[in-house]
């Protein structure tokens, strides 16, 4: 019951506080149950509850390809068809082209919609009840927020269950605690964290979860081959492919086991046939949808030429700063190499796992948009993460051999540090600081800046001295002392370290100085000072010609110090920042604007700014 309330706290943001309370109850119940030696179900529910409250706090986004996956669910549930024209219209999107059957084209698989359906049904029931009682504003039409948040609930539940199965697959190789450390680390240091909590309406969290199911089923079939275990293994392959057709490469794993057990006479051919049948049966919904949409039982839904099977970008999808698997998520490289350590003791599993990772890289390297548009990290390696987790398990065992006291605490600390890095990277990605390439030098600087912000925020609660100490430790640069002796900020420069939020990219126009647009409603600069003193300052600024009357409020650390008009010609506007509105360490001077002009790129240009002087 507590887990259900926590899920409702995710589905309806108004119940977020109740969701946090429900998680506390679920966690306490799980702890008490474990002390009594109760089963694992209560722990799984508590973990799912934790995922629900994390997602509720993060506030999932429904962007990128989310609509392409969700439209199946909405259209089948409400319209009882696969005609997506009304959904595209409702979302304000251009109509997709017609297929050979006269329906709207949709290249995305149907599998995720089928897995999300139970959670979608719960959200629909909730919306129906609250709408009938007049308690909430949601309309029972499949478009409102509870329906979309239900996708997050489904993805979190799947990742929780899949992660637990992956932990169970490591029984006998690691203890429960050690396996939990490894699996949690693999999730939090990979793109799976992003696609579970931030953009859960895509296939990647589900693909990861089903690949975990596959790994568990493989170990069950390897340990005790039976008709049932082999059927589950085949079913898992079909389910992975149902969520993403590229997931067919996981079939290399049961193929390797079949060869091994046929040689050992440990498996009957009809069991393998049953596995193949189960896989085909699981994949059948996708085949039916392709037939209805495209008029073919089997097709390349993205169109001919989508994959170049020579894989010209194989190295890029692994090592490029533009969404490379090992570049954006370096722990994945460690885990992949760790699979080599498994070869002596588990040659079939380790060899097949390496083959799956390699095949995934080969396919991804041949895809037309190999870097994947609007993607955090190498999202198409979702199915490889469970295998990488096994490599991390092997690496952890080897690394802890020479450690006597709490060796796995060290492993947890290392994975935790990389998880913090990954969470910081996700935050930067959400802020659009990095969208395509993420050069390490810039990324490291941005991460350090975020760390400083966190420490500065904590120090602010303890007073000016604490903030000054943090600034001196993390930055140590001060205007008029050891950097920027004249206090001049060249706003139009290509690289201006003193700009904070609210600025466009630099621009050049004939007859204008180099400048940036200050974006509505606010643009800020950073002013580090060794000692606060009054700053008689000026800003070279002009309003867009199409804004007849622009006003600008100037604030120092949140306090208004001046309100001035902004002319439609370049002018140096003078203002004074009083000493009492400044502190030792970093200060933030902001410029707030009354009106904005939609621009070509960002839609919120408020004023052009070329230079700020704070002498």
Regions found by a protein language model. Give the residues of each.
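Membrane-proximal envelope and lipid/glycan-remodeling enzymes
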Residues: 1-487, 491-493, 502, 507-510
């Amino acid at each position: 019951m507590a887990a259900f309330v926590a899920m409702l706290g995710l589905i309806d943001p108004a119940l977020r506080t109740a969701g946090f309370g429900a998680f506390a109850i679920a966690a306490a119940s799980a702890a008490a149950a474990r002390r009594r030696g109760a089963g694992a179900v209560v722990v799984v529910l508590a973990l799912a509850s934790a995922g629900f409250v994390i997602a509720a706090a993060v506030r999932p986004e429904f962007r990128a390809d989310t609509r392409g996956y969700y439209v199946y669910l909405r259209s089948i549930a409400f319209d009882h068809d696969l005609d997506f024209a009304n959904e595209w219209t409702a979302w304000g999107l251009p109509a997709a082209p017609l297929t050979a059957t006269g329906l709207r084209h949709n290249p995305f698989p149907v599998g995720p919609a089928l897995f999300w359906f139970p959670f979608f049904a719960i959200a629909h029931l909730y919306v129906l009840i609250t709408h009938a009682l007049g308690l909430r504003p949601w309309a029972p039409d499949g478009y409102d927020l509870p329906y979309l948040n239900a996708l997050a609930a489904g993805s979190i539940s799947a990742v929780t269950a899949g992660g637990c199965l992956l932990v169970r697959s490591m029984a006998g190789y690691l203890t429960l605690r050690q396996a939990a450390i490894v699996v949690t680390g693999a999730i939090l240091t990979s793109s799976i964290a992003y696609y579970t909590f931030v953009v859960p309406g895509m296939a990647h969290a589900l693909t990861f979860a089903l690949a975990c199911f596959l790994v568990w089923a493989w170990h069950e079939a390897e340990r005790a081959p039976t008709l049932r275990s082999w059927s589950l293994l085949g079913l898992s392959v079909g389910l992975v492919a149902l969520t993403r057709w590229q997931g067919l490469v996981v079939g290399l794993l049961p193929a390797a086991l079949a060869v091994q057990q046929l040689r050992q006479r440990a498996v009957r051919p009809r069991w393998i046939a049953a596995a193949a049948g189960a896989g085909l049966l699981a994949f059948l919904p996708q085949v039916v949808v392709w037939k209805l949409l495209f008029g073919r039982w089997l097709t390349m839904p993205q169109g001919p030429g989508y994959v170049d099977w020579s894989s010209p970008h194989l190295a890029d999808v692994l090592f490029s700063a533009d969404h490379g698997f090992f570049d954006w998520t370096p722990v994945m490289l460690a885990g992949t190499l760790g699979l080599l350590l498994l070869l002596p003791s588990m040659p079939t599993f380790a060899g097949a796992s390496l083959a799956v990772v390699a095949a995934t890289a080969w396919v991804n390297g041949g895809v037309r948009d190999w870097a994947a548009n609007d993607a955090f990290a190498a999202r198409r390696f979702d199915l490889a993460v469970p295998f990488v987790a096994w490599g991390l398990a092997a690496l952890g065992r080897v690394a802890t051999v020479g450690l006597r006291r709490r060796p796995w605490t060290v492993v947890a600390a290392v994975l935790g540090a990389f998880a913090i890095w990954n969470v910081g990277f996700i935050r930067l990605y959400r802020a659009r600081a990095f969208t395509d390439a993420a050069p390490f030098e810039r990324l490291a600087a941005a991460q350090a800046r975020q760390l400083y912000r966190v420490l500065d925020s904590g120090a602010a609660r303890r007073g000016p001295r604490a903030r000054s100490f943090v600034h001196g430790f993390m930055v140590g640069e001060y205007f008029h002392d050891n950097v920027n002796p004249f206090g001049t900020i060249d706003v139009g420069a290509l690289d201006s370290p003193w700009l904070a939020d609210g600025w466009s990219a630099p621009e050049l126009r004939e007859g204008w100085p180099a400048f940036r647009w200050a974006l509505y409603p606010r643009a800020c600069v950073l002013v580090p000072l060794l000692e606060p003193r009054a700053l008689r300052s000026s800003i070279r600024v002009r309003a867009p010609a199409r804004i007849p009357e622009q006003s600008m409020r100037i604030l120092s650390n949140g306090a208004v110090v001046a309100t001035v008009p902004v002319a439609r010609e370049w002018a140096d506007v003078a203002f004074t920042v009083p000493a009492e509105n400044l502190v030792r360490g970093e200060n933030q001077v902001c410029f707030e604007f009354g009106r904005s002009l939609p621009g070509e790129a960002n839609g919120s240009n408020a004023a052009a700014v070329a230079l700020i002087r704070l002498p």
